[in-house]
Amino acid sequence: MINKNIIRTLLVETPSTPGNLGKVATAIGLAGGDIGEIETVHVGVNYTKRNITVQVENEAKLESLLDAVRELGGGIRLHTVSDDVLRAHEGGKIQMKSKMPIQSLADLRRVYTPGVANVCRVIEKEPEKAKIYTNISNTVAIVTDGTAILGLGDIGPVAGMPVMEGKAALFDQLAGINGVPILLNTKDPDEIVQTVKHISPGFGGILLEDIGSPHCFEVEERLKRDLDIPVMHDDQHGTAVVTLAAALSACKSAGVDLEKAAVGQIGLGAAGLAICRMFMAFGVKNVFGADKSAEAKERLKGYGGHPVDSLEELMEQSDIIIATTGVPGLIKKEWVRQGQIILALSNPKPEIEPEEALEAGAAYAADGRSVNNVLGFPGIFRGVLNAGARDITHEMLVAAAEAIAGETKPGDLVPHPLDPKVHEMVADAVERAAFASEKSSQKVMGR
């Protein structure tokens, strides 16, 4: 399956005689496009206008597709081409709104001066009351320095804001959490850590997002050590949770015992190392890893994994292959062993296309579009915030992965990312794990 990242909507007019819409669809398919939604916007006396959403791999293929539609003739006309993705981002995707209407002086006195002074004094005397009288305990900072935005790299924090807004929107819709993007105009780990520590009183948790390797490790480790609220780097642990869930589902379908399988991780960056640690936390004994970086391989060794020198060796030794290198086509078909499970997770293009891996004998294969960390972070934070947990442990993350796998339908690797039940189950599993590991402040207080 080729990743098709360019989405456009075509306004196409066709004569009302049968077969003309089929001609348009055929032209789009032959030009390498996929058709999404088709919406009839106007029916004339002898013509019909439709919005047709198409997806293509790149700009060159888009131009070829448009030319193919324009050249159909016979009364078929391409009127406009619009970018609905850009349009959806106009004005941003999130907003901050008041929960209370302020329509009278009495309202004003209750929500602001003079009434608010008494609330401040209550919190001053009993700081724990901030959880009751403010939104702090339900608010998560989404922090980035813009150094590792999706598959785009170091494009800066402002260019990465659409990702942070998307994260905040998902927090709200899937977990009822207030996500606040925090853009940091620094790449210095000390400055990042100090800034987050200074603003942390206003948040119930910290989600680190798209912070590059290797300084992401130091930033997360220091913040987890110094703060008494949960901190998680989503590119590491969110990805690892959903990857473990996908592997659990695949192993269940194939009749494989994951704990006894050999797992090979290609790419030991932020996500790759976290995936290795997640599988080891689950109980997998043989976790192999390959990377060009000697430092990364030493990190893996320190975590208890087994570095290998070549991809061929890793492919030969492993039952389950996971790749997070960002290098398209890195895995050769001839390296694939019969019955392997292959998760090539790099976006926008995977290390091997799922179809190629399956043709070469893989039992299961998927790319990063189906294994999406949106299945993890909303429920994980909902669970830790509900529990009042001060940390996010591997036990909680494994519980989240098992919950996701438990909601996966037969034949799928992971459930639908927008299924509310999935996020509820993840939150419940994480909350239970938090209490079981005695990381919850509320449990310590006797809940």
Enumerate the predicted regions with their spans.
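Rossmann-like adenosine-cofactor binding region
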Residues: 303-365
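General beta-strand structural signal in soluble alpha/beta enzymes
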Residues: 78-80, 207-210, 231-234, 289-290, ...
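Glycine-rich phosphate/diphosphate-binding loop of Rossmann-like nucleotide-binding domains
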Residues: 150, 157-175, 233, 237-326
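Glycine/serine-rich phosphate-binding loop and adjoining beta1-alpha1 elements at the start
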Residues: 77-261, 381-385, 437-439
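A conserved regulatory-domain signal marking ACT and ACT-like small-molecule sensing domains
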Residues: 1-90
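Adenosine-phosphate binding glycine-rich loop
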Residues: 230, 234, 344-346, 351-445
